[in-house]
A protein has these predicted regions:
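A conserved hydrophobic secondary-structure block that centers on an alpha-helix together
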Residues: 282-286
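Intrinsically disordered, low-complexity regulatory segments
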Residues: 1-166, 170, 448-449
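Phosphate-interacting basic helix/loop segments used at nucleotide- and nucleic-acid interfaces
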Residues: 72-98, 199-200, 278-279, 391-397, ...
């Protein structure tokens, strides 16, 4: 008899149906020479400290560090688990062979290996390795069963991870609880959770300690187009006023007009982290909710394996893509075949689907490829599932569209003042981006407006970046036709602005920070290079964030993640950089990947951790300070904090924003750019912005803002003023 063991009953049921083992028994199904049984995720776990010796049952500093000579596993103490395990054990001990049908990943390998070890299975074991749960994929997987030994390094990496987490977590948690917890709370320390908490705490301190500084921006309006001085911002008002007086009343001359064509490739396919990031940005789904939704879509056969960290497909997927697209075209979301026109447009070209190296690259795929639709048309999706499927389907469709072609126009100008003994010149610049052929952007045409509005409302809510330093974004707009050498009158302005603090983390930005070990990069290629040293795995990051919530170390305020007093004091108490450093934790992750790739010895990894925990214990025990960590309760989290002003602190005698504009062509008059009194209700939506006079008023999440926020307009009217 061949025993198949799946990771959950629903998967076992699908497998049993396909291989003809449909008659149900108690805890398994049987037929056609197969017995198909299942686990419920983890049935086994590493032993607790007191399972090794009674001396480790009581929490005591003198017992630390606790390092067993040999790590063992035990059955999780649950009646349902024990009953199912007894069934599995009986089947395995009588089996001729076993097929490991666990989740095709590191954790899935560990789950099933531990069960087989505990059941003392002695027969040969094959491995079912598939990336989707469609009938076709399962049939093909059974035709191409692998020898389990091919996945030994995957198991060793998972085992090393589990043992490493035990060594650090068990010892450091007891150490810090006993030393700093005042016998009133458990201070949980984890290899991934503590550096993640440190990211949030450090960002919060940056914000709390941020001192807003004024700066001045010189610009001028020529032919209804705003040019900005290339000299950058002025840090003193005097410098700005001097530059302003230099150009006031003098003609503006266009010195150069250049056009450059460019291509913008479609965005990469989704891995788990990028999907969680987009779901948080677009729908405010937590990482944990997104993981559950995509897992559900996978189990319903609508999308491929979700716990992946690659955004590429293998070459063997390419021949299947037309069939997948055909299935996606039949999908009905909210009773509409919304993907059919997009896929018909692809077919109308009469060409084969393009095979780009940015999509298909065997060298960028290890266990599983990027998340894509399976081609099975979804039915009965919840609204939340439909949102996630929509992202995946559109991303898959878009990679077969041509690049977006655009033209960037850059116009340079100058104002020269020859009144003094030496001519003074100030140069200006403006850029505009014109879409020539939208290419893949047509897939997102209906989403574009909503996306822009989301960004605009973030600005209206006061989330306009950090430290005044932003990546230059060329606005999509068609500039007037300028000619080199033309000259005329212009309207200069000197605007006072304030540097702004960094933003609080959201789950989206925190996931990105975890992925790149705290390094903040926007470039997709560079981010991919940093992934190997990220903290945590794609599949575990959502759980880590949820753990921080459960421990009352962090809390949510709208979409922002903020540390509680307990979380802040815990990080302040930890002086051992190893425990809270993203970089060092990232190196651990790299070593675990190397174990998986057979280039690093698991024994060296564990021995290194043993040395490190010994050092940490010695350092903490030698601390003679009276430090302790505050307690944050559930009641504390429910308390409503007093509202804080969104504007950063400013020195007295300074205005929010001030502009200088020429009057009668030869003098300048100072004007205040404060928000005029307006009704704080929806009646102002669509009206001309009272600050810049160019944009219109839009509604954000907590305030009204200006549609010209990208152009620098700072108008903001909170709802609270109603």
């Amino acid at each position: 008899m061949i025993v198949c063991i799946a990771e959950k009953p629903s998967v076992a049921k699908d497998i049993a149906r396909i291989i003809g083992a449909t008659p149900a028994r108690d805890g398994y199904m049987e037929g056609n020479g197969y017995q198909v049984t299942w686990t419920f995720g983890h049935l086994c776990e590493l032993k607790e400290p007191d399972d090794y010796t009674p001396m480790w049952k009581r929490w005591s500093l003198s017992a630390l560090p606790m390092i067993p000579q040999r790590f063992g596993i035990k059955l999780i103490n649950d009646e349902g688990i024990r009953k199912q395990f007894n069934t599995i054990e009986r089947l395995m001990q009588a089996a001729d062979s076993i097929i490991n049908c666990g989740d095709a990943g590191q954790e899935g390998e560990l789950i099933q290996r531990w069960v087989m070890q505990k059941a003392q299975a002695k027969c040969p074991v094959k491995r079912l390795w598939i990336s989707s749960m469609t009938d076709e994929a399962i049939k093909q997987g059974f035709q191409e069963l692998k020898d389990q030994n091919e996945y030994q390094s995957l198991y060793l990496a998972g085992l090393s991870r589990a043992i490493g987490d035990w060594i650090l977590g068990m010892n450091a948690t007891r150490l810090y609880t006993l030393k700093y917890g005042q016998n009133r709370q458990v201070l949980s320390i984890g290899r991934v959770q503590t550096p993640t908490l440190a990211l949030i705490v450090n960002r919060q301190k940056e914000i709390d300690n941020f001192v807003s500084e004024p700066y001045w921006v010189l610009a001028t309006i020529y032919r209804d187009t705003q040019f900005t001085a290339t000299s950058g911002k002025f840090t003193s008002k005097e410098e700005g006023e001097k530059a302003f007086s230099t150009i006031a009343g003098k003609p503006f001359t266009v010195t150069d007009v250049s056009k450059k064509k460019g291509n913008e490739a479609p965005p990469h396919l989704y891995d788990l982290t990028s999907l969680q990031v987009d779901c948080n940005k677009k729908f405010a789904y937590s990482a944990d909710i997104t993981l559950k939704l995509i897992q559900s879509l996978y189990e319903k056969k609508y999308t491929t394996y979700p716990r992946v960290d690659t955004q590429f497909l293998t070459d063997d997927i390419y021949p299947k893509c037309p069939q997948i697209l055909n299935g996606v075209s039949q999908a009905k979301i909210m009773s509409q075949q919304k993907y059919l026109p997009l896929i018909q447009q692809l077919a109308a070209t009469g060409k084969k689907l393009p095979k780009s190296k940015k999509v298909f690259d065997n060298s960028k795929v290890t266990d599983h490829h990027a998340i894509i639709p399976t081609g099975v048309p979804p039915t009965g999706l919840t609204d939340m599932e439909a949102n996630v499927y929509d992202l995946i389907a559109k991303r898959f469709i878009s990679v077969f569209y041509p690049d977006c072609k655009f033209s960037t126009t850059t116009v340079l100008g100058e104002v020269i003042n020859e009144d003094g003994p030496k001519p003074e010149k100030i140069e200006f610049k403006v850029s505009g981006k014109e879409i020539l052929e939208p290419g893949w952007r047509v897939v997102y045409a209906k989403d574009a407006k909503n996306s822009d509005d989301d960004d605009a409302t973030d600005n209206a809510n006061g989330n306009d970046g950090g430290n005044g330093a932003k990546k230059e974004v060329v606005e999509e707009r068609t500039l007037p036709s300028f000619v080199k050498g033309e000259s005329g009158e212009h309207t200069p302005t000197l605007t006072e602005k304030w540097t702004t603090p960094p933003k609080y983390y959201t789950e989206a930005t925190l996931l990105r920070a975890m992925e790149t070990a705290g390094k903040f990069v926007e470039d997709e290629e560079l981010r991919a290079a940093l992934k190997e040293n990220g903290i945590g795995r794609p599949s575990s990051r959502a759980g880590i964030i949820e753990t921080l919530f459960k421990r009352h170390y962090i809390k949510r305020q709208r979409k922002n993640l903020m540390a509680t007093p307990t979380g802040i004091e815990l990080i302040d108490t930890i002086h051992e950089e190893l425990l809270k450093s993203c970089e060092l934790t990232g190196i651990w992750e790299k070593k675990l990947r190397d174990i998986e790739h057979k280039t690093y010895d698991p024994a060296d990894f564990i021995n290194g951790l043993k040395e490190q925990i010994n050092q940490i214990v010695n350092d903490v025990l030698s601390d003679n300070s009276a430090r302790h960590v505050a307690i944050t309760t559930e009641e504390d989290l429910k308390k409503k904090e007093p509202s804080k002003k969104t504007a950063p602190k400013k020195s007295p005698k300074q205005d929010d924003t001030a502009e200088k504009t020429p009057k009668n062509g030869d003098t300048a008059e100072k004007t205040e750019s404060r928000s005029p009194k307006l009704p704080a209700d929806d009646s102002i939506i669509g009206k001309t912005c009272p600050i810049c006079g160019q944009g219109t008023i839009i509604k954000g999440k907590t305030a009204y803002g200006c549609s010209n926020w990208k152009g620098g307009c700072q108008f903001r009217l909170p709802f609270s003023q109603q």
